[in-house]
């Protein structure tokens, strides 16, 4: 029986993870749950799952949860703050950690799981975007196992030979006959909207994704295609690709989740309904297969499958991310920080939709100008850079 810590338990990925665990209750025990500040949802999860441990990033929320659990005679030990999340990520009795905390906040807890040599189900793409080689080196150093949860990276993973699956971050695609990886994306809700109308997009419009059910931040990132840009950076690290080996393709139907092209002309594609329970189940039981609760794909009802080149004038954030990927670690760390700040401001109705790109570009340019030669050889140096980039973004936001 696998014993799990679920980081980001109250979010979309966390909920899907627990759904898969419930489908296969004889195979999984939920030992610990971690979240940010959603006390009510966390209380409900603790009532249902009776975990030994829980952790809340917000100390006040942790205290409220502790009181609520105690008054209901639930014996779950509650930890607080980033330290609490790191603690439940490295518990001796846990062998598998679902890393699903959104954004930079997930970096340290995820790295704690890596340093404890756990099986990491990586849904937090920002951890790799922010730390890159440092993360990959830590996985090897501490004997952790890395399995990608993002639907696209999981699709690529499934289309690659086991010898690559077992050596993520250090694989040689060329030696295994792989010519290129095709990273697919739906293009979001505005792929056919007139570009001149994007300035009027509201948060409500941006979070209404046509295919996937996701949280607000990732939904906005999908609308700008920054999400695909971050996934591009993650794929570069996971699969050790060159620029020539990694391509982005718009696929509006979200049926093919990504593809791998081989030198002999073969293309392997992973297909399925757009439901995160599929890649989650794949990683939770790897290398076995278990039920995810997702309906099988009915090919008679799919209709057409279409593919388009990405238009960078429509998706400038995608171009920013791809450029940052080849500019160095300072660029990807800085861009991720800027994007988190600008998307939060957009969701709070403080800036417009097209301002997101403008803020991201300003911060990226400033970070590249000031920190190009900065030695980023520790988590502390990355976190310092992340903080400085957020300060740059906050300054830029005040001028909008």
From Swiss-Prot:
Its EC number is 1.1.1.267. SUPFAM superfamilies: 1-deoxy-D-xylulose-5-phosphate reductoisomerase, C-terminal domain (SSF69055), Glyceraldehyde-3-phosphate dehydrogenase-like, C-terminal domain (SSF55347), NAD(P)-binding Rossmann-fold domains (SSF51735). Pathway: Isoprenoid biosynthesis; isopentenyl diphosphate biosynthesis via DXP pathway; isopentenyl diphosphate from 1-deoxy-D-xylulose 5-phosphate: step 1/6. It catalyses: 2-C-methyl-D-erythritol 4-phosphate + NADP(+) = 1-deoxy-D-xylulose 5-phosphate + NADPH + H(+). The keyword Oxidoreductase applies. It is an enzyme of class 1 (oxidoreductase). GO terms for molecular function: 1-deoxy-D-xylulose-5-phosphate reductoisomerase activity; manganese ion binding; NADPH binding. Catalyzes the NADPH-dependent rearrangement and reduction of 1-deoxy-D-xylulose-5-phosphate (DXP) to 2-C-methyl-D-erythritol 4-phosphate (MEP). InterPro entries: DXP_reductoisomerase (IPR003821), DXP_reductoisomerase_C (IPR013644), DXP_reductoisomerase_N (IPR013512), DXPR_C (IPR026877), DXPR_C_sf (IPR036169), NAD(P)-bd_dom_sf (IPR036291). Mn(2+) binds at residues 150, 152, 231. This is 1-deoxy-D-xylulose 5-phosphate reductoisomerase. GO terms for biological process: isopentenyl diphosphate biosynthetic process, methylerythritol 4-phosphate pathway involved in terpenoid biosynthetic process. Keywords: Isoprene biosynthesis, Manganese, Metal-binding, NADP, Oxidoreductase. Belongs to the DXR family. Its cofactor is Mg(2+); Mn(2+). 1-deoxy-D-xylulose 5-phosphate binds at residues 125, 151-152, 186, 209, 222, 227-228, 231. The keyword Iron does not apply. NADPH binds at residues 10-13, 36, 38, 124, 126, 215.
């Amino acid at each position: 029986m696998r014993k799990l810590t679920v980081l980001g338990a109250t979010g979309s990925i966390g909920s899907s993870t627990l759904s898969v665990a419930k489908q296969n209750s004889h195979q999984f025990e939920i030992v610990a749950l971690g979240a940010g500040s959603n006390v009510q949802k966390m209380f409900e999860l603790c009532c249902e799952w009776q975990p030994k441990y829980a952790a809340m990033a917000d100390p006040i929320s942790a205290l409220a949860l502790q009181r609520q659990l105690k008054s209901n005679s639930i014996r779950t030990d509650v930890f607080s703050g980033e330290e609490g999340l790191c603690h439940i990520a490295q518990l001796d009795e846990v062998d598998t950690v679902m890393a699903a905390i959104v954004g930079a906040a997930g970096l340290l807890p995820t790295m704690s799981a890596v340093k404890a040599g756990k099986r990491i189900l990586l849904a937090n793409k920002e951890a790799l975007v922010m730390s890159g080689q440092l993360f990959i080196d830590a996985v090897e150093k501490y004997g952790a196992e890395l399995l990608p949860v993002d639907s696209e990276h999981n699709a690529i993973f499934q289309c690659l030979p086991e010898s690559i699956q077992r050596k993520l971050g250090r694989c040689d695609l060329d030696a295994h006959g792989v010519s290129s990886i095709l990273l697919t994306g739906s293009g979001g809700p505005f792929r056919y909207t007139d570009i001149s109308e994007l300035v009027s997009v509201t948060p409500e419009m941006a979070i209404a994704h046509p295919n996937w059910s996701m949280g607000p931040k990732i939904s906005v990132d999908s609308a700008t295609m920054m999400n695909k840009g971050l996934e591009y950076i993650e794929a570069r690290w996971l699969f050790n690709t060159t620029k020539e080996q990694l391509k982005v393709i718009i696929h509006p139907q979200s049926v093919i989740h990504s593809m791998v092209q081989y030198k002999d002309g073969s293309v392997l594609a992973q297909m399925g309904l757009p439901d995160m329970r599929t890649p989650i189940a794949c990683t939770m039981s790897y290398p076995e297969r278990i039920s995810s609760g997702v309906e099988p794909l009915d090919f008679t009802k799919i209709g057409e499958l279409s593919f388009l080149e990405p238009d960078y004038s429509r998706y400038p954030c995608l171009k920013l991310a791809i450029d940052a990927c080849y500019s160095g670690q300072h660029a990807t760390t800085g861009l991720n920080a800027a994007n988190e700040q600008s998307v939060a401001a957009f969701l709070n109705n403080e800036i417009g939709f097209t301002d997101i790109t403008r803020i991201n570009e300003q911060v990226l340019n400033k970070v590249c100008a000031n920190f190009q030669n900065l030695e980023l050889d520790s988590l502390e140096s990355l976190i310092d850079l992340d903080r400085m980039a957020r300060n740059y973004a906050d300054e830029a936001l005040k001028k909008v």
